[in-house]
Amino acid sequence: MGPRGAPLLVVVLVLGLHALAEGEKPSPCRCSRMTPSNRKNCGFPGITSDQCFNLGCCFDSSVAGVPWCFHPLPNQASEQCVMEVSARENCGYPGISPEDCASRHCCFSNLIFEVPWCFFPQSVDDCHY
């Protein structure tokens, strides 16, 4: 392999590792708590549930007119904290620290502005594929 082949090999290895990392089946809460109207397509027409899960995506064919294979909600430290931002119920105050939020036994995520950063957890009993 010549000097021009080495960068290509690096790209192939990086893409392969990225594919392996993304091929993990998401948790049930990351899928079932996604509102159908907010689903972002992650597959192709006719994709099977196994193919979809192998892409690291969610699959639900029970709702017509929306993607059946879709990107999951973001991962959280606890399954109880996985939810759409519209479902967050405030558990703190503006500017609360992650430590103060945790002392209230609540979830913390400051990635999105103008929504509660400290919010009550939800039961995982309703999570399913």
Curated annotation (Swiss-Prot):
Swiss-Prot/TrEMBL keywords: Disulfide bond, Growth factor, Repeat, Secreted, Signal
Disulfide bond in keyword set: yes
InterPro entries: P_trefoil_chordata, P_trefoil_CS, P_trefoil_dom, P_trefoil_dom_sf
First and last residue of the signal peptide: 1-23
Tissue expression notes: Expressed in the digestive tract, where it was found predominantly in the stomach with highest expression in the antrum. It is secreted predominantly from antral mucous cells into the lumen of the gastrointestinal tract.
Gene Ontology MF terms: CXCR4 chemokine receptor binding; growth factor activity; structural molecule activity
Annotated Gene Ontology cellular component terms: extracellular space
Coiled-coil intervals: none
A biological process from GO: positive regulation of cell population proliferation
Job description of the protein: Inhibits gastrointestinal motility and gastric acid secretion. Could function as a structural component of gastric mucus, possibly by stabilizing glycoproteins in the mucus gel through interactions with carbohydrate side chains.
Localization annotation: Secreted
Disulfide pattern: 29-127, 31-58, 42-57, 52-69, 81-107, 91-106, 101-118
Designated name of the protein: Trefoil factor 2
CDD domains with a match to the protein in the record: Trefoil
Gene3D superfamilies for the chain: Spasmolytic Protein, domain 1
Domain annotation P-type: ranges: 29-73, 79-122
